[in-house]
Amino acid sequence: MRSGSPKRVAPAPAARSLALATLLAPCAFGPLAAQAVERPATRDTAARDSATGEPHDLPRDTYADPGVADLIRRARAERYARARGLQSFEVTFRERIYAGLSGRVVRRERAVFHQERAARIHWDSDGDRIVRWLGVRRGVPIAGIGTEFDEEPRTDDVFDLDFEFLDPAEDRIFLGNEWALHPLADSAGYHYRYRSGDTLRIRFAGADRTVTLVEAVVEPREARFDRIVGSLWFDLDDALLVRAAYRPAIEYDFAREEPEDADEVPGFVKPIRARVEYITLDYGFQELRWWLPNRMAFDGTATIANYASMPVRFEWTFEDYSIDQPQTLDPGEDALPEGWTRWVEQDVEVEDAEGEGGSGDVPQPAEDDSLPSRDTRVIHIVPPVDSLLAAPELPEPLFAGSVDAFDDEELDQLRARLGKIDVPRPELPGPQLLAGPLPGLLRYNRVEGISTGARFEWPTGEATSFEVTGRIGVPEWEPGAELRFVRETATGRLGVGVYRRLTDLGDWGRPLGVGNSVNTLLTGYDDGLYFRETGIELFAGHGGARSSWELTLFGERQQTAPKTTNVSLPDSWGERILPPNVSAERGEIAGVSGRLRMFSGVDPGDPIVSGTLWGEAAAGDFDYGRLALSTALTVPFPAQWTLALEAGSGTVFGHPPLQRLYHLGGPYTLRAFEPGAAAGQAFWLARAELGKGFRVASNDGYGIGGSTFRVVAFGDAAWAGDRDAFGTEGWRASLGAGFSVMDGLLRFDIAHAVRGGDAWFLHIYADGLM
């Protein structure tokens, strides 16, 4: 409980990071931030072993060996002994947070949010805790929006700081803005198993001292998001936690964790999942006496509707400790320099029996008057806010390619260690039938017309399911069906399926997505060329930090799919008729196809290189191979000017059917031309764009690029034809102007063909060059 002067509750760092990741999809982590840890029925508090202090009915398999049993019992007893004999310390604290937007629907990741903070902090075991802020910077790079401070700093949440994470008397295990059940809680044995791990001895030659660190591996009894798998390292002499690497036992699934709320969320953003890759923290051995906070890092990814993903990272570092020295940070209200701000927050906190501040899993509660309490003040001191943005103490943003708190080798090792810990099979939701305006179930194109479908999903594991999808289009009346068994996580997928479906040529864009459906109806422009396929496939995909790949093995029969409708808004005015579809050749083939996407960075203030390599090889009625490469470069200039260049080329070997040639035309290749206006065994394309950016808010002092929207001028040139005639004869070109929102996430272009045609086109599409 808290009393004293009012205080906003500062969210835990992970919760803040996750919440910030939802700027473009608010429902992604909202349920996660709101979930409460379930409390089991209260047990008899007197039923404890007099020797161990643990409940008599603790499961026999709680400890795999006597060594880990003794270690965990001692660690539980010594949880609050970390600060024993420590009067005070000062330390420099730095924080970095990053949230991005990527996924299968975009060519490269965009930086959605970042925050960097630096402060000098004073902790006192009996007196005030002091935070002198050194620097603060945060913004939304995708929109070019930087830090804007409140007129009154004490009301600005950018200065919120949860001191419990910095308190050496704490060893918090956190998840979202709720605590996961701590593996050292009195009741933890009902929910975790423990076994001994590795041993590490560190010798401090100058002090002639050796410290032995021992590992306890934590396995959850239940496959729940608020249970952890963990590798905990303790100082063997003191049984103090000195390093931890852990993650939730399973992925977060919105439908499973919050079924009632999930029913109220629009279907087009489902499923909503989140995977925490790791949470890791360690302590430094200050003056070879006290284990005090050193580093902390978090990495997670959320996915929306299996198309968009939102990576979230944050890290803390603690440097330049000064132990048991008089405080130097607070000059007092009267001596405060001009332009500085000082305020005081007063907290009285009573901890529950688990030491978790009232949000733990508490089967054995204690009376409040038997628990430790604290009555402390937190003093915040803020210099003039204009000086905070460019403070030299600020770390570089996480997306700037600077050195991280933990190097790649350390993170790879802890991922591997966590991946070896057993997790029980989770409780599965029942099968469900999905229909209506959901991703992949409702669409419109000139072949099917209005095509609607229904999907039956039967979960078979934590991330696996069996799916049956059926659909039919009007006026085509051609049925389609897919049966798939798929394993899908926040970072990848693997599956097998059989199908009879309409597909697009697959080289550029997403013609069967929602965007092209709306575009077809409103503008009379269908960006797709389609054919029908029936077959079987084995598919896999994975998304990494700066790359992603997809691979498919297939055997199928391909056939033509003629146009069946002209309905669109311009058609109702008699101004435009949808063009015919490509005439696909019928044949049976088997082969492999793949796609690799890469990009160099996400900072809109730096040049960004992105590229896609894709190919296919097949044999059967047609024997052929395809290979193509497209590369783009975006270069920022002063005054929010940006230049983007793209070049691509590809060729086909052997004897492909018509539908496996390259077909140019449309917003991603050659604007102002119909899809398929140029087609052949080989192609090249070159595109250039020059944009002037504008921001909706002042960015004084914000040194990171980005624009809320841009006005863009562009030109496209391309050629497609016979491979032996590769060159410029018959090349086509267009010029135009457009409007870009949020770094090209949404584009509106008007293009005019200037070579090889004279048409005008309006293009509305997603994921432009800039």
Please annotate each region the language model reported.
Residues 94-96, 123, 298-299, 457, ...:
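Outer-membrane beta-barrel pore domains and translocons
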Residues 17-30:
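Bacterial N-terminal signal peptides
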Residues 146-172, 416-424, 440-442, 494-541, ...:
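C-terminal outer-membrane beta-barrel translocator/porin domains of Gram-negative envelope proteins
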Residues 35-229, 250-258, 275, 300-436, ...:
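Structured extracytoplasmic
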Residues 70-77, 351-473, 479-481, 498-500, ...:
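Outer-membrane beta-barrel initiation region
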Residues 1-15:
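N-terminal secretory signal peptides that target proteins for export/translocation
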Residues 75, 230, 236, 278-287:
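Extended lipid/amphipathic-ligand handling interfaces
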Residues 594, 737-745, 758-770:
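Outer-membrane beta-barrel "beta-signal"
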